[in-house]
Amino acid sequence: MKDNQAKYPQLRFKCFTDPWEQRKLGKMGYTFTGLSGKTKEDFGHGNAKFVTYMNVFSSPVSNSEMVENVEVDSKQHQVEYGDVFFTTSSETPQEVGMSSVWLETAENIYLNSFCFGYHPMVEFDPYYLAFMLRSPVIRKKFMLLAQGISRYNISKNKVMEMLVPVPEIVEQQKIGSFFKQLDDTITLHQRKLAKLKELKQGYLQKLFPKNGSKFPQLRFAGFADAWEQRKLTEIVNRVNKSSNSDVLPKVEFEDIVSGEGRLNKDISSKLDSRKGTLFESENILYGKLRPYLKNWLFPDFEGVALGDFWVFEATDVSVPSFDYYLIQSDDYRKVANDTSGTKMPRSDWKNVSSTDFAIPSKDEQKQIGAFFKQLDDTITLHQRKLEKLQELKKGYLQKMFC
């Protein structure tokens, strides 16, 4: 493909009809290296800062706070506003050449040695540049440049030969502003979600007794009695109904989102004839394998649990939703983490089942269960909103660049 060949994106803002130029990066700017000649003694102190590899890797726009101290000399290249950073190496070709644009004017800032920099010499809207370089059409080009077997690398000279779409600056500004606003909205939802999850963890700490105590730190009004000590087998039954149904959905350990008690994908079509433990709606699925922050699910459907799961059902002396949150409490997790085995450590049923847990009256169980259920519903709502926004962004990145 020749430089300057015209193209049209699939989706555009109104009033823009001109074709987009395809231009080589190397004809619009120059590259520079990151820190060189440094030893580990140079890092962690000094008056200069450097942009970390993870800062570049994790976002199309660099975070000015993700920098660390370093001692520098006059040979090093300071970064400037509008510079682009590229990662040069990764374990997979999909993650090579991840880009990030620096939008700060602070001095004495440098780039880490595992990335290279690019300084544009033509006018670019920085946000257009940031999201264009992360668009699927450009990411595919980077993957094709990746070379290696156990670790993949790219040549900055090859990157400079890459053709990228360059519309008029006014259209760039429109696109850049659009994606910046969308990213800001996503960030806002991520922060809200993180705060809700922190809130839940705080309440799990305070609404359940700790370290053998019979009284929680925080209680609902009207409850003052000591909690009774009950073994787990007194509040849940362990289900052992095996099934190899090829009609019911199958749940595996990796399907559960870490620490959230929900599935990370739709498993309705994941049907096969493998044998597992049959579970019903509102049973509790508890994975025995580490990590234990990713091992519980309270399904609202019937299915088959494959592999290392315990399936619990609440007994008639307790409230199902209370059991669900009891299993997330600190005391239960300590017992579950008392594992046996080395290669694949597992919780020990004899240990878990015989351990005493503090249990309140049924009325207090209802209050606690309802409270956490409402909090979980709010978390799920924000999670879904966030996922929809992320899918929306993914779709626009696919259609708005060529």
Feature locations, PLM:
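A short glycine-rich beta-alpha junction/loop motif
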Residues: 5, 36-39, 109-114, 146-171, ...
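Sequence-specific dsDNA recognition surfaces
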Residues: 26-39, 54-84, 235-240, 248-281
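Extracellular/lumenal glycan-associated surfaces
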Residues: 173-185, 189-192, 228-230, 284, ...
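Short, charge-patterned binding micro-sites
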Residues: 23, 106, 110, 214
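Short amphipathic coiled-coil heptad-repeat segments
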Residues: 1-17, 191-225, 384-402
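Short, recurring structural edge motifs at helix starts
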Residues: 1-2, 10-15, 37, 70, ...
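A short beta-sheet element
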Residues: 52-53, 64, 69-134, 264, ...
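Non-catalytic DNA-recognition/assembly elements of restriction-modification systems
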Residues: 12-35, 219-242
